[in-house]
Amino acid sequence: MMANWVGARPLLILSVLLGYCVSIKAQEQENDEYDEEIACTQHGQMYLNRDIWKPSPCQICVCDNGAILCDKIECPEVLNCANPITPTGECCPVCPQTGGGDTSFGRGRKGQKGEPGLVPVVTGIRGRPGPAGPPGSQGPRGDRGPKGRPGPRGPQGIDGEPGVPGQPGAPGPPGHPSHPGPDGMSRPFSAQMAGLDEKSGLGSQVGLMPGSVGPVGPRGPQGLQGQQGGVGPAGPPGEPGEPGPMGPIGSRGPEGPPGKPGEDGEPGRNGNTGEVGFSGSPGARGFPGAPGLPGLKGHRGHKGLEGPKGEIGAPGAKGEAGPTGPMGAMGPLGPRGMPGERGRLGPQGAPGKRGAHGMPGKPGPMGPLGIPGSSGFPGNPGMKGEAGPTGARGPEGPQGQRGETGPPGPAGSQGLPGAVGTDGTPGAKGPTGSAGTSGPPGLAGPPGSPGPQGSTGPQGIRGQSGDPGVPGFKGEAGPKGEPGPHGIQGPIGPPGEEGKRGPRGDPGTVGPPGPMGERGAPGNRGFPGSDGLPGPKGAQGERGPVGSSGPKGGQGDPGRPGEPGLPGARGLTGNPGVQGPEGKLGPLGAPGEDGRPGPPGSIGIRGQPGSMGLPGPKGSSGDLGKPGEAGNAGVPGQRGAPGKDGEVGPSGPVGPPGLAGERGEQGPPGPTGFQGLPGPPGPPGEGGKAGDQGVPGEPGAVGPLGPRGERGNPGERGEPGITGLPGEKGMAGGHGPDGPKGNPGPTGTIGDTGPPGLQGMPGERGIAGTPGPKGDRGGIGEKGAEGTAGNDGARGLPGPLGPPGPAGPTGEKGEPGPRGLVGPPGSRGNPGSRGENGPTGAVGFAGPQGPDGQPGVKGEPGEPGQKGDAGSPGPQGLAGSPGPHGPHGVPGLKGGRGTQGPPGATGFPGSAGRVGPPGPAGAPGPAGPAGEPGKEGPPGLRGDPGSHGRVGDRGPAGPPGSPGDKGDPGEDGQPGPDGPPGPAGTTGQRGIVGMPGQRGERGMPGLPGPAGTPGKVGPTGATGDKGPPGPVGPPGSNGPVGEPGPEGPAGNDGTPGRDGAVGERGDRGDPGPAGLPGSQGAPGTPGPVGAPGDAGQRGEPGSRGPVGPPGRAGKRGLPGPQGPRGDKGDNGDRGDRGQKGHRGFTGLQGLPGPPGPNGEQGSAGIPGPFGPRGPPGPVGPSGKEGNPGPLGPIGPPGVRGSVGEAGPEGPPGEPGPPGPPGPPGHLTAALGDIMGHYDENMPDPLPEFTEDQAAPDDTNKTDPGIHVTLKSLSSQIETMRSPDGSKKHPARTCDDLKLCHPTKQSGEYWIDPNQGSAEDAIKVYCNMETGETCISANPASVPRKTWWASKSPDNKPVWYGLDMNRGSQFTYGDYQSPNTAITQMTFLRLLSKEASQNLTYICRNTVGYMDDQAKNLKKAVVLKGSNDLEIKGEGNIRFRYTVLQDTCSKRNGNVGKTIFEYRTQNVARLPIIDVGPVDIGNADQEFGLDIGPVCFM
């Protein structure tokens, strides 16, 4: 409680003095007609008329028109404490404060009400000594004197504690006016002023000069019960006598009896919110609520184990300045550093001796408007709390009634800087004020002597980077440092570009013979086969060892919302969040109780001031006057004569930079001395001249980390540093956690009607309404379009047949008749033809999710689709054993800049490093505290003003001034050209999950379009009308910093122009050559936005540039975006119970909660029964084109084609020339000899001989040899057309053989799939029932024995052909010519659509498929296809074999077997060429193989 009171008192004084100043101003205006007041001087210090000051702790003085009246402060004799102490600089002892001496102004909790404080009695100011009278004997107590005239109003006092009510006295008669009182302060105020200085010690912290005596204040509160004598009997009302002379102060009377208990006080304020009551019984289940806000951030987890070293991340964003770390141990003395930069201006020295009064200066510019003080209520309000932090700007209140114009207040003294408030909402644009005239520059004061070295203040907040300074002249090279220790091996740099080929090196010497090498790896494989499809998913491996951290992956697609998780345990209470923005106005509260009486009215016109009298005795309280009405504002008086010079004030803010002096010549560098021992610290020297900027030294090697020092003692609190420049606008912070609830705010006024809200969610479809009443009959419509034919009417009676009349002219269509009665509703019409597509409707709100439909009928297998995009990565496979290092690749192109990674977790603290080489000169330290004031010097004579000097060259930028008041906003400038597009921000925080939309109909899958070429940047469109402000989105995080653009060439030096307007801050350029400092050029117009250039190679790191001077304070930025959601306010007072509301609508379906934690992995279930064979899968994509095979042998001549149909008869030819004479004999007889006799039993002549040609002669016999030849030829042709599967006539496939000879039985036959010569035919087994062609392995079995006796890696197959001694991959076909079978199988695959093969694994103590002990398939045998595809027992069904029998699941010493079968339509995967058992390696584990034939169909 005491701390609260102490913290509040300076603020109370401030309000008193401000109110005091306002009164003075009014008084001054009224007093303009009177004489000027005379100031006082004491000890060389000037005080204005009616100033009050304390020259010593126990003395108080007042200036009365040139005369100084002083008096002693009396202290109370009794203090309610054991060991009172007198603070330094105070007069009266006080009780020591209990508790820590923490005077921090942080907001503490409100304490309980304290005991009434002791108010020391201050005797009034001592009057001038009168003539000494003879000492008289003590006379009897005189009658009560007449009531004195009210003294001039003193300043409003600090509210005192409520006094003990005295006994009611009899009303006395009003006395005659007496002499005026001694001073302008009522006794309670002077006591409080004295008590404030004595008790709190904070009066000096307020930093206010005592003001002059204010006008008459309102009547002070009832004082404490005095310790004067006992109450005498009330005398009869006497005639008002003339006022007698002031008698001497009587001796103190005995202590009076305690007064009666006072009347009840006014009701106190509401107490603090009580403790939360116990939970009530659970209420009825409520309707589903709207989706909740994101929960609070969870606790920080325990620190995990140290992970392996990750890859070097992208450079992180610049972090905020960390807190000051603990002071490390004192390091060893470093070598002498380079000369430092020129230091900043030191603090202002102690004030010099008081000079003679100068001539009155010109009137200064108008001071800033002071804070108007508010009038306090009379009465006894409680103690003021500490000042809270400045709140956010509230919403604009309604326009109040126009108040009467008050008297203008005087300029207040500069108040203490308040806490920086949060940015208010932008105010309406004010009118642009006219620029004031700038005052003349003051004379420069003499430089003070350097103050003592202050203790180091806390590290200030890092300021903004300054603009680059003008490059200094190159300094002399410093002495070369000693070589530093070797640094730690740095990380491997990025690969450089490939260098040119170096010259051939000399041959080296022959090395010693190496040790015996291990068994070599298997030889190179043959040419790779065509790429197979991806293998089936491998069995679930056991959890591998922790891998090294991979590089950060790209930003993944947002996941689907998870199911709601269980509510977590209640977290610990978080720290209070940051102060949120002010909440909206609450509803109007109930009217409060009647307020206290208003303040007294304004003072009447003041009479001529009398001379200040001595303090009279305190008169009895007069009756309260009626509150006066507010007087009209007085006319402003004339400006008074300037006062005398005031005392030198405290050090002001740093002034603007002075003009630059001319550069001195550079002295010659002295020789470098040896390093001496460190001497004792000398007295603080005067500030040396600034050394030139040294050349940055080469960075020393990084030393090893030294041991961590012990935590140093906390240093003394340093002086507060100079207020830094406002930093650049920081990134918008993330949402802080919800802070504690604030107290309920005052009830606000009802706001205006808000804008219409967003479109609501579509409601559920209402029930159909009842039909409405029949409407009134409408007016007759316009003529309608021709109607459709009506229904047939009822059949009429047949009329008499009339004669056919002539066709009349078509009559005009008659008017439509009156509307008939409404017919019954017709039956539903046929659907109309499809209308044209309407305009695209606005996107509707997502409806609730419909129920899942029934599964549809299985569709026909679709056509094979185009090759899809790469699928999402599958589950992470087992970590492979590390492969050998590959050769270094060609350096890749520079990748695009990655998104900024999240900050890594804090690592374990490293051990402290050794002391590194001395760093570059640090930034100048904060200014030390001001030194003790020097002695007063003799006042000098005022010199004549000198003539105006010429304007000096522009000096370097001075230190930043304190931020100026916000200027009036200028008129809007022309909009600048569009800037280049900024980098894309990183993905913002994930928003609240939206309501689930209605399930849309499944669209047809579109083909992916080709990527278009990026269009050129279009012309900038015209500025559109300003849209309504959108809702404030969550703040995005900063995008990555763009690459720096190319450097422009340096321009020629121009002639120095006049100083232009300050341009906007440009990018930091490279330091140019050291030119003479030119005056600042005008800013160039921004160039057009160039097309983005290609990313350049990463440049070498530049050397560190010189530290530039601090830049000027930037213009005030635009108001930032709306801040994050503020903390939740405290619960308001509980309202009256409302009436029961209507039943609410059914709530929307709640959002799915976050996914619960993954459960532990269950053990693998027992394998289910094999399902039915699935339909054949789609045909896979064609394999890569194989290498062309060797040229095959020329095939046998083909079968003669059948005779074509006879063509049409041709025209008769020209008659030929006559032939030569023929030989003698019968041609027909010769034919007959050849062909034999023609009879009817013979078969028809060959088709070549038709009936119109000569028939054979039937007279001669046939030669039987020709018949045999023809039959043989016919048989050969027939076997060529339908080969019989013999070695001489091999079939192409068994399926061909079955088609040509359906009656053949299954067995071994010869086939020649590549046709051509039958020499390379192979012997196969043909299954004539299915048409399969089966090729046997050679050898077809592997004997059972222990093939592998060393431990195998966990769950990795050990290949029989690749890894095991005396093992080999399987071959097929003839053992003598295995290549023939390979070639023929290549053609056979082209002729087949399906392949299958069985393999039997004979086991003893080794698992073939199911591990009966672990109940999983992790140790199942792995098969390898001919395209190196691994075929496994689990995973993708396309790469998974089936098991026909398995008796190898137990390791019981028995021999068992597992029969594997694999069928595939990708025939390139078969035959199986290798087997990889997993469960082998022990001496008692044996296996053998029976390799079945591979069958193609």
Swiss-Prot record:
Molecular function GO terms recorded: extracellular matrix structural constituent; metal ion binding; SMAD binding
Disulfide bridge positions per record: C1294-C1326, C1334-C1495, C1403-C1448
Keyword Disulfide bond annotated: yes
Annotated propeptide span(s): 1228-1497
Entry GO CC: collagen trimer; collagen type V trimer; collagen type XI trimer; collagen-containing extracellular matrix; extracellular space
Pfam families named in the record: COLFI, Collagen, VWC
Domain VWFC positions: 38-96
Modifications made to the protein after synthesis: Prolines at the third position of the tripeptide repeating unit (G-X-P) are hydroxylated in some or all of the chains. Probably 3-hydroxylated on prolines by LEPREL1. Hydroxylation on proline residues within the sequence motif, GXPG, is most likely to be 4-hydroxy as this fits the requirement for 4-hydroxylation in vertebrates.
Comp. bias (Low complexity): 155-164, 210-225, 320-338, 425-441, 602-611, 744-756, 824-839, 878-891, 1091-1112
Assembly and interaction partners: Trimers of two alpha 1(V) and one alpha 2(V) chains expressed in most tissues and trimers of one alpha 1(V), one alpha 2(V), and one alpha 3(V) chains with a more limited distribution of expression.
Free-text note regarding domains: The C-terminal propeptide, also known as COLFI domain, have crucial roles in tissue growth and repair by controlling both the intracellular assembly of procollagen molecules and the extracellular assembly of collagen fibrils. It binds a calcium ion which is essential for its function.
Protein name: Collagen alpha-2(V) chain
Gene that specifies this protein: Col5a2
